[in-house]
Amino acid sequence: RKPGGQPGHRGHCRKKLTPTREIYLPAPEEVLHDPDFKKTSKTITKQKIDISVEVHVTEYHADVYYNSKTGERIHAPFPQGVIDDVNYGGNLRAFLFLLNNDCCTSIDKSRRFLSDLTDGKINISKGMINNLCRSFAKKTESQRKEIFCDMLLSPVMHTDCTNARVNGESSYVFVCAVPDGGVLYFARGKKGHDGIKGTVVEDYQGTLVHDHDVTFYKYGTGHQECLAHVLRYLKDSMDNEKGRTWNRQMHSLIQEMIHYRNGLSESEEPDPQTVSEFEERYKTILSIAGDEYDYEPHGKYYRDGYNLYKRMKKYKKDHLLFLHNCLLYTSDAADE
C-alpha cells in the first residue's frame, strides 16, 4: 500500500496542546464599519505549535575569605556537579547521549548538530561525548543488575545478535528484551556461545523469541521463531522463485494466523479446533513445497527458499508455538 492516509480510513487528526500564549485577533475592518454584523457566541481557535532552543548559563560567584592569622582561604561550596570552570548540565549531557546512542548519530554529527542549534555557542569535544557512555554505564550499574534479575523471571524474552564495530573492529551486540519494556545490551567480541556468556540468555529458563540462530536453541525451555523474519524470507522467495506456489500460500497463512492470534484478548485461549486447522494447512503447504522442489530443484545461485522450507519443516513446533502460548508475540521486534 502507498504511504500516508488510506482511502476509507478515518484520519489521525493532530491533537491540540495547552496553549502557552493566547492571541485574540481583532475584528475585520468590514465588521467594524457595518452595523449589520453582530458578534456570536462562537469562537474559532487554531494553534501553531513550535519549539525553541535556548542556552541557559548559570554562573556561580563565591567570595574568597582570608584568615590573616592562619593564612587559610575559604569560600562557599559550589553545588554538586559544579567542579570545573565550565561544566555541562544534565539536560545537555542527556541530549547528547540519546542523540549519539538512541538515534545512532555519530559523535561528529552529534557535536555539530548541537553547535548548529546554539549558533556555535556550544562546541563540545569528542572525548566528552565519548565518555558519556562510560559515565552512563557506571551510574546505572545497580539498575542494570535489577533489570537483569527481573528478566530471568519473565516467562518470555526476546533476543537477537547484531553486528557492530568498536574502534574499527568487528564486534557483536546481544540484545535481551522482555514484554514489560526492560532491555539490556551486551557488547561482545565473539558471537555464538562465547558471546552469550554473561548475558541474560545464558541462565534463562523461559521461552525465547528469536530469529533462526541455532545457538539460541541451546538455552531456555521453549522457542518461538520470529515470524517477521519468516515473512521477509518468504517474500524474498516469492521474488526469486516466481514459479513456485508454496511460498505465497505460506506467506498468506502466516499472516492469517498472526491476525487470528492478535485478535484474541489477553484472557482468551486459542480455539483448539482452529489451531488444529492452522497446523494441518501448515503441513499441507510444506508438502506442496516438497513436491515443487522435487519436480524442479532449487537453482544453483538461489537456495534460500529451499533452505527456508527445510527449516520450517524441521522446526514446525517453534514456528507455531505462539498459537498455543498466549504470552508470546509473533516477532522479536521488542529487541529490534
Where do the model's predicted regions map?
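Conserved beta-strand -> loop -> alpha-helix junction used to position metal-binding or nucleic-acid-contacting
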Residues: 212, 221-249
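Long, amphipathic alpha-helical stalk/connector segments used for oligomerization, subunit docking
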Residues: 253-308
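Short conserved beta-strand segments at catalytic cores or DNA/RNA-binding microdomains
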Residues: 66, 99-106, 170-183, 230
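Conserved small/polar residues in nucleotide/adenosyl-binding loops
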Residues: 329-335
